[in-house]
From Swiss-Prot:
Protein name: Pantothenate synthetase
Summary of the function given for this chain in its UniProt record: Catalyzes the condensation of pantoate with beta-alanine in an ATP-dependent reaction via a pantoyl-adenylate intermediate.
Assembly description: Homodimer.
Residue numbers binding beta-alanine: 79
Subcellular location as annotated: Cytoplasm
Binding site for (R)-pantoate: 79, 171
Catalytic class of the enzyme: ligase
GO cellular component, one term: cytosol
Lineage: superkingdom: Bacteria
Catalytic activity: (R)-pantoate + beta-alanine + ATP = (R)-pantothenate + AMP + diphosphate + H(+)
Binding site for ATP: 47-54, 165-168, 194, 202-205
């Protein structure tokens, strides 16, 4: 994999302007110098193909006027399995850089694969048992790849805060766990899912959907809403309501629909839970999730 074309790259850091860095040592030197002046660093990790969900992360990051926002753009090969879409994953680097510029981002980190991993990487971060459940059951090795690149980014950038979208909820839980258990001194914050007006969770992979498939994909968010609405009646009612919605859409091939607690253990009898769904619509694999309030606390809807 070759490095993205160097767009607007320049040495160091220019306040109020965008600087693109490609080598880890370059960026680490800049963020170290910024911290020495009392500036905070906030990291927004992405694989590019930026959409409104990513831009919301950036806007949240920029709310802290003392923080310099670093957006990383790197399509991480370690988190793609055989037969997945690493080669075809959307790459829109120049457009992404311009989107970052428009949002007031001052640092973009767009490294080459070899600069991140070296010629013969041997070490990965093991996600533990949760890494083999839900997404991990369908995508073996995926979360080892995710945690490894996130650990590397946190080590290179040394941010005070890193923001992740809640759409990849299992990923968020595992990253928080990694930071806690490995004593990584970065606060990990989840940002609520950004949805299209019709309810579809925004994803870079939505571009793969045909018009018909996109309509069918709305069954995922509709199922979550139905499940959340049934929360007062308990866990079985939540799952039953969601399954009934999914069963009405023949183009949706369900992978899993599960109700867990907020740390992705067994669902509680009452209180906050998370309803998670994954399905293929056509050839595109989509995931979504929603908070559910079980028992007398009422219902919650995506």
């Amino acid at each position: 994999m070759t490095a993205p074309e160097r767009v607007g790259a320049g040495p160091g850091f220019a306040p109020g302007a965008l600087t693109v860095h490609h080598h880890p040592d370059e960026l680490a030197k800049v963020t170290r110098a910024l911290r020495a002046t009392g500036r905070r660093i906030t990291l927004v990790p992405t694989m590019g193909a930026l959409h409104e969900g990513h831009l919301e992360l950036i806007r949240r990051a920029r709310r802290d006027s003392n923080s310099v926002v670093v957006v990383s753009i790197f399509v991480n090969p370690l988190q793609f399995g055989p037969g997945e879409d690493f080669t075809s994953y959307p790459r829109t680097f120049e457009t992404d850089v311009e989107a970052c510029r428009a949002e007031g981002v001052e640092l973009v980190f767009a490294p080459d694969r070899d600069d991140v991993y070296g010629p013969d990487p041997q070490i990965t971060v093991h996600p533990g048992p949760l890494g083999d459940e839900l997404e991990g059951a369908s995508r073996p090795g995926h979360f080892a790849g995710v945690l490894t690149i996130v650990a590397k980014l946190l080590g290179i950038v040394r941010p005070d805060l890193a923001l992740f979208g809640e759409k990849d909820y299992q990923q968020l839980v595992l990253i928080r766990r990694m930071a806690r258990e490995l004593n990584i001194d970065t606060a990990i914050q989840g940002i609520p899912i950004v949805r299209a007006p019709d309810g579809l969770a925004l994803s870079s992979r939505n571009v793969y959907l045909s018009e018909e498939e996109r309509g069918a994909a709305l069954a995922l968010s509709a199922a979550l809403a139905a499940g959340a609405h049934a929360g007062r009646e308990g866990a079985e009612a939540v799952l039953r309501a969601a399954r009934e919605v999914l069963a009405t859409e023949p183009l949706v091939r369900l992978d899993y629909l599960e109700l867990r607690d907020t740390e992705l253990g067994a669902a509680p009898a009452e209180g906050e839970a998370r309803l998670l769904v994954a399905a293929k619509v056509g050839e595109t694999r989509l995931i979504d999730n929603a908070l559910v309030l079980l028992g007398d606390q009422g219902d919650s809807r995506p």
